Amino acid sequence: ELIGAANRDTKSFSINRKDAKERVAKAAR
């Protein structure tokens, strides 16, 4: 159960980082 929650957090964290990178790239343009 703990591992499942950690995996979910890691997945959403990497998704958030990807979104942030795309936002930064758009802002830089």
From Swiss-Prot:
Got a GO cellular component term for this one? ribosome
Enumerate the UniProt keywords alphabetically.
Ribonucleoprotein, Ribosomal protein, RNA-binding, rRNA-binding
- Which cysteine residues pair off into disulfide bonds? none
Gene Ontology terms, MF aspect: rRNA binding
Q: Where is the composition biased (Basic and acidic residues)?
A: 8-29
Report residue spans for region: Disordered. Answer: 1-29
Cross-referenced InterPro entries: Ribosomal_uS7_dom_sf (IPR036823)
| Role noted for this protein | One of the primary rRNA binding proteins, it binds directly to 16S rRNA where it nucleates assembly of the head domain of the 30S subunit. Is located at the subunit interface close to the decoding center.
The UniProt similarity line reads: Belongs to the universal ribosomal protein uS7 family.
Q: How does it assemble?
A: Part of the 30S ribosomal subunit.
Query: What protein name does the entry list?
Result: Small ribosomal subunit protein uS7
Q: Which organism is it from?
A: Methanosarcina thermophila
Organism lineage reads as:
Archaea, Methanobacteriati, Methanobacteriota, Stenosarchaea group, Methanomicrobia
